[in-house]
Regions:
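Active-site helical microenvironments for divalent-metal-assisted chemistry
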Residues: 1-163
Length: 163
């Protein structure tokens, strides 16, 4: 893939997700961000979006901090690209998590997350759509019972994001 900075971003994301596995398949977790990045690149051919797709779970699911990610991006890209990628990753990072909002049930957290994403940039929403598509394939194949719940949540999320 001829994307500016892609290999450095891929290494950073791979290192950040080291030891994490995909639910159901036990594959290295990094296979998911790579698949999302491939979908995004094929559809939009936007280097910054592709790199953000690779990093979309780094702040949410790893020990990497906002400051560490910003420093890495500023070493790798122009200031403009670094801030663009960082902004996309922040938009894609769940705020309404179980840890941050323990008094909210799953349905409430997902609804608030949908409302938050309604105000995300169009490009962040396009990455999120690719993320949902890739996760949906895996869940449909490996956990049809949970897929009913998951897909209903994602239909609701998409209605917030694109209406």
């Amino acid at each position: 893939m001829a994307v500016l900075g892609y290999e450095k971003v891929k290494k950073f994301a791979t290192d950040a997700h080291r030891g994490q596995k995909r639910k159901y398949t036990d594959e290295d977790y990094i296979t998911h961000p790579i698949a999302v990045a491939n979908l995004v690149h094929a559809r939009y051919e936007d280097d910054n979006m592709t790199c953000a797709a690779l990093l979309h779970d780094v702040l949410e699911d790893t020990t990497v901090t906002h400051s560490e990610l910003r420093a890495f991006l500023h070493k790798t890209f122009s200031v403009e690209s670094a801030e663009d990628i960082l902004s996309l990753v922040v938009d894609l990072t769940d705020v309404y998590t179980k840890e941050a909002f323990p008094d909210y049930n799953r349905k409430q957290r997902k609804a608030f997350e949908g409302l938050r994403l309604a105000y995300a940039s169009k490009r962040a929403k396009q990455i999120k759509k690719a993320d949902i598509e890739h996760n949906s394939e895996s869940i449909l194949e490996h956990d049809p019972k949970f897929a009913k719940v998951f897909l209903a949540e994602k239909v609701q999320l998409m209605s917030y994001m694109f209406n």
